[in-house]
Amino acid sequence: MMTSTFGTTVKVSIFGESHAPKIGCTIEGLPAGFTVDLHELKTFLQRRSPSHPWDTPRKEIDNPKFVSGISAKGILDGFPLTAELPNNNVRQKDYTATKLVPRPGHADFSAWAKWGNSYKQTGGGHFSARLTAPLCIAGGIALQILHAQGITIAAHVLKIKNINDTPFKLIDNSVEANKLLALQMNQLLQAAPQELPFLDAQTGEKTRALLTQLRSEKNTVGGIIECVATGVPAGIGCPHFQGLENTISAAVFGVPAVKAIEFGSGMNVANLLGSENNDAYEVRDGSVVPTTNHAGGILGGISTGAPIWFRCALKPISSIGLSQHSVNLQTMESEQLVVQGRHDVTAVLRAVPCVESAFALALLDTLYSWPSEQNGYHND
């Protein structure tokens, strides 16, 4: 048994496998009457698609076919929305050697331990990053709904190996700092889909050189994505197990390769004194706001009104072109394995819109499920 569903009010189910005829998603709880900009959604999906020499050579035309829940003009009807994408460019022969020999770093062994030989592992099966395409369909719609309510989400690659990008201006929650943050977010949101998701152009050039080198070495690399949302009202969320951090984390860990997440000052809070970590308050334009944002916009599982921000770490792509030690699950004998197929050098660049999507779905679900009871937010 398993589930690939997320959400309380806005529920998202992802279906299909890497080499199945189709993949897709079903979304429940979307507001009736909202008009989705289908061109904007298509542009958003292009950010996830491979377009660089270090990306997988597997090309799929990710033009979603909407089965229900939305009109040809993009108007939501309030009923479950289902979208499908065909898988046309598959090569199952690349996975003959790994049918009984689990690939190190992949979910092959853990899936076999759960489902035995019924698990379809070609292309990574249901665990494949190919499934982030329907995630981005759902997330792209959620991003538009949030934006209509004044909430904006943006992300960039903060670190890849030893190359660091300029971080968002986030600890300081002053008016001046928020203006700079808005400029940084706008730079990313206005970039063309094929542009690398960095704030510093020099970081992009260094990354190009690194990934070109790693491809020639048949190796891979991970990285860190930094993501932020502005315009989130204070008072949404709830304590304990359905808190904002819990919900966002659950969604973000649904992005393949994500292995860690931290909010605000994160692990560094262990190095701070209380007088350094506490975010003081002031009245600004009639509202109470934190003057700093070590908390990452969340306290007690509930939003503070400051930008919500986190960083997540992605492991290197597990499929490498080097010989690795594994075992044959049938003979129970050792085997050396060289993974075949078409793979990326890194997941971190193409994962940026995927992380934004997961974040958007978590925020939208929280906004509708656990609104501020003081400000009157509710699901219309």
UniProtKB/Swiss-Prot annotation:
Domain of life the protein comes from: Bacteria
Annotated NADP(+) binding sites: R48
Single GO MF descriptor: FMN binding
Co-factor(s): FMNH2
Record flagged with keyword RNA-binding: no
Binding, FMN: H126, F127, S128, G300, K315, P316, I317, S318, S319, R342
Pathway info: Metabolic intermediate biosynthesis; chorismate biosynthesis; chorismate from D-erythrose 4-phosphate and phosphoenolpyruvate: step 7/7
InterPro entries to which the protein is assigned, alphabetical: Chorismate_synth, Chorismate_synth_AroC_sf
One Pfam family from the record: Chorismate_synt
Assigned EC number: 4.2.3.5
Catalytic activity reported: 5-O-(1-carboxyvinyl)-3-phosphoshikimate = chorismate + phosphate
UniProtKB keywords: Amino-acid biosynthesis, Aromatic amino acid biosynthesis, FAD, Flavoprotein, FMN, Lyase, NADP
Keyword Lyase: yes
Any one GO CC term of the record: cytosol
Function: This reaction introduces a second double bond into the aromatic ring system.
Summary of subunit composition and partner proteins: Homotetramer.
UniProt record similarity statement: Belongs to the chorismate synthase family.
Alphabetized NCBIfam families for the sequence: aroC, PRK05382.1
The protein's name in its UniProt record: Chorismate synthase
Underlying gene: aroC
